Regions:
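N-terminal loops that bind phosphate or other acidic moieties
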Residues: 1-133, 137-376
């Protein structure tokens, strides 16, 4: 008997690997001979570094970088030595969670730290990059990241523009004279599940600006500045296309990657499933187990568990899912490859208690045990 687990993290509660271990514990209470293969899962957002480092035999790295407010933060990323691949979550260097509510202001927040992480990984020999760009605090069009990599963004006096979206207002010239030479050898797979363009009603500023602290007047200004930046970039880099889907991701970071580096934007779950080679594990499995913290209609619209389920159904494998909470509309998941799903809560409790790491792991193990007794 072979069971493959590929469970997304229960955010704020347990990691993907912890969830897999909990299921293993529950199954082995019934039959210790069952071969349970734990494959970490993520969707390109939070938990991607954790999942890919575990799934690809990587090592975690820590580096102090310039945070979104211009002050130092410690960012964790992963290196897969065998393939010289770095796994980075931009939110670790420029994420919204690093900015207190009272300091949210995209005119000043920068992606400079993201570039510093990339530069550090290049210095350690990496030439492949997997980067999740969700959860940003920024709207600087990625110029901060590019500045850290050696690109010049100059004002009319030939001086570097300041950090943040306000730097775009002063922008007159873009140079690549001092770009680190190894950058041209690098390939970037960017985990991006939004289709917003750089500018306009569905652009970076209009759609995501408010949650980053932008006022209506700021949104109008930043949209205008980003449009000018895109036009200026196109003069030097003809492939620049501000209307391409995903260029508005992470405050224009998607545009920066596509224009200034050798990058492709891809579905986060697609990247994770391919990089962890989950398909090879599923081919001869008897059962596939997936899940996430909350199962609902949004899950059915293409979140990580559905990616797993679709892969499993390619080989006719049964799929069950576990979740911390299950909404009534989660039944739509049954139409997308999940044969049955189960909440793991054992009784009435507070959210705080339910999300405690030890409680969550115990509840998942107990539920997995009972479900396996029925399934075997």
């Amino acid at each position: 008997m072979k069971i493959v687990t590929a469970i997304d993290s229960f955010k704020g509660s347990m990691t993907s690997m912890e969830a897999g271990l909990a299921v293993t514990e529950g199954v082995h209470r019934v039959d210790s001979d069952v071969d349970v293969q734990i494959r970490p899962l993520a969707d390109g957002g939070e938990g991607t570094v954790e999942a890919l480092v575990a799934g690809m035999n990587g090592m975690k790295q820590e580096i102090q970088v310039t945070g979104p407010l211009g002050t130092p933060v410690v960012c964790e990323y992963g290196i897969i030595e065998s393939s010289k691949t770095a796994v980075i979550e931009m939110a670790g260097a420029a994420g919204i969670t690093l900015v207190p509510d009272e300091k949210k202001n995209p005119l000043y927040t920068t992606t400079y730290g993201v570039g510093e992480v990339i530069k550090d990984a290049i210095g350690k020999g990496c030439r492949r990059f997997i980067i999740g760009i969700g959860g940003s605090a920024t709207n600087d069009g990625g110029i901060g990241m590019l500045q850290a990599l050696g690109f010049g963004f100059m004002n009319k006096n030939g001086q570097p523009v300041p950090f943040g979206a306000r730097g775009l207002e002063e922008l007159e010239t873009i140079t690549d004279t001092y770009v680190i030479p190894e950058l041209k050898e690098c390939e970037f797979r960017i985990a991006c599940d939004v289709t917003n363009t750089l500018c306009g009603e569905q652009g970076a500023s209009a759609v995501y600006g408010p949650q980053k602290g932008a006022t209506p007047s700021m949104i109008m200004q930043m949209d205008k500045w980003l449009a000018y930046y895109a036009a200026l970039a196109k003069e030097k880099f003809p492939k620049a296309n501000a209307k391409q889907a995903g260029t508005g991701a992470a405050g224009g970071l998607g545009f920066a990657f596509l224009t200034f580096t050798n990058a492709v934007l891809e579905s986060g779950i697609k990247i994770v499933l391919e990089e962890t080679q989950l398909e090879e594990y599923i081919k001869d499995a008897d059962l596939v187990v997936t899940g996430e913290g909350r199962l609902d209609r949004q899950t059915a619209m293409g979140k990580a568990p559905i990616g797993v389920a679709k892969l499993a159904k390619k080989y006719g494998k049964p799929v069950i899912a576990f979740a911390g909470s299950v909404e009534r509309d989660a039944r739509e998941c049954n139409e997308h490859g999940i044969d049955a799903f189960f909440p793991i809560l054992r009784g009435i409790t507070t959210l705080e208690e339910a999300m405690k790491n030890e409680n969550a792991k115990r509840n998942l193990a107990d539920t997995a045990e009972q479900v396996y007794r029925l399934w075997r």
